[in-house]
Each structure stands twice: as C-alpha cells, then as structure tokens.
Design a protein with these regions (language model features):
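Acidic two-metal-ion nuclease catalytic site recognized across multiple nuclease folds
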Residues: 168-223
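Conserved non-catalytic scaffold segment of RNase H-like nuclease domains
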Residues: 1-115, 126, 138-152
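Catalytic subdomain that performs nucleotidyl-dependent activation
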Residues: 115-133
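Acidic, Mg2+-coordinating catalytic module of metal-dependent nucleases/exonucleases
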Residues: 86-92, 98, 135-191
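Alpha-helical structural motif
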Residues: 50, 74, 95, 117, ...
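Short, well-ordered coil↔helix boundary/capping segments
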Residues: 130, 153-156, 210
Length: 223
C-alpha cells in the first residue's frame, strides 16, 4: 500500500540558478488507484521577483501574486503534506530542482527525494513508447483524457490531468474520483515505474540561451 502525490509547479523561468523561483505548487492525491478530491494541495507563492515573460506560459501576473505567501511561509505545511509519499512528476528533475533550491534558500539541507520516492512519468512514457511525443497534451490525446480546460499551464490543473494520465499509463483506475477516501496507502503491485536517482539535484534540466522566453516555451512544449 502506498500513497501517491501527483505534483506540478509553475515558475518564473527554467533555471533556479539564474534566480528564478516557484510561483505555484499543485498536488493531487491517488489512493488505492483512485484520485481523491478531498486532499489536494494548492498554493500560489510570492517569488520576491518579477514574473517576467513567463506570464505567457502560465498566465500568472505580478499583480495576482501580490500578497501571496512566500515559500518560507508555506514550506512546513507543504513538506508535511508530501512527507513519506511517492511523488509522480512529469520531468521530475525540473520540479525537484526548483523545490530543492527553494528549500536551500529557506536554509534547509533537506531534499525532496530524501523524503519521498520519485516516479518520473515522462521517463515512464519514453520507456513505454519510444519515438513518440511525451508532453502532457500528447499523452491526453493518446489516452483520450479531456484536457480542454488546459489553455495555459497551471500547477493544480496539470497535476489533476497527470493523475489521470498516470493511472491510464499503469493500467487504469477503479474510480475517477473518490471524495470519501484518503489514507497513507497506494497499491502498486504489478506496476512498472521509473524512479529518479538520489543524485537528481546534480542534473541540469535545460540550458538557457540568449532568448530566455523562447527557451522557456520550447522546454514546456515537452511537458
């Protein structure tokens, strides 16, 4: 039995080493191969910098983020929510890189992958069907999952959609939503999973070029 948390983030750019920060975290819970509605996690975060051109990707403006809590104000609640769970993330090095960077800025030596088991759904998709497209929109078309609400990137919406995609990739689900059930267990017998190595923090996800927005858009076309 294992509890799965499907996680996504939105950020101001593609490289935390260049000062980019998280602006949104969204999580959806899966228990016993059912997506639960009553235990999601969703938080907008004040990045302490301008959003810049990345607003074209996610539609989140500086004005909207005014007054939102800083990462240091939500970190305890967030870590309590995910602690001990198995995280499902599409292109895990990107989100983990940002989350671990935020933890470091907070003054913590913790890393997400030291607290949670990681499943990279992007790598799983590549193993299942090499040579095809593996971004979220393509996977929705492959598994006939409705993504019509996805007009821009959004952490919670993308986590909700990825939860459906992941279950379809790994054998389907018993019920789409269960608002009654939320526990610490998830049965993953006979599932093929791809786990991210412990040294994932050393992986460089995307190399930024002179045209940051173009790179940002090209990167997100894969996820």
């Amino acid at each position: 039995m294992e509890r799965l948390i499907v996680l996504d983030t939105e950020t101001t750019g593609i490289e935390p080493s260049e000062g980019h920060r998280i602006i949104e975290i969204g999580c959806t819970e899966i228990v016993d191969r059912e997506i639960t509605e009553n235990n999601e996690y969703h938080q907008y975060v004040q990045p302490e910098r301008n959003v810049g051109d990345s607003v074209r990707i996610h539609g989140i403006t500086d004005k909207f983020l005014t007054g939102k809590p800083k990462f240091e104000e939500i970190v305890s609640e967030f870590m309590d929510y995910i602690k001990g769970a198995t995280l499902v993330i599409h292109n895990a090095p990107f989100d983990l890189g940002f989350l671990n960077h935020e933890l470091k800025l907070f003054g913590s030596d913790e890393r997400i992958e030291d607290q949670c088991t990681i499943i990279d759904s992007l790598e799983l998709s590549k193993q299942q069907r090499p040579g095809t497209l593996h971004n979220l929109d393509s996977l929705c078309r492959r598994f006939e999952i409705d993504a019509s609400a996805r007009t821009v990137h959004g952490a919670l919406l993308d986590a909700q959609i990825l939860a459906q995609v992941y279950l379809a990739m790994t054998g389907g689900q018993s019920t789409l939503f269960s608002s009654e059930q939320s526990s610490d267990g998830q049965n993953q017998k006979n599932q093929k999973i791809v786990r991210v190595k412990r040294d994932i923090g050393t992986i460089k996800v995307v190399e930024a070029n002179a045209q940051e927005l173009e790179a940002h858009q090209n990167y997100f076309s894969q996820t």
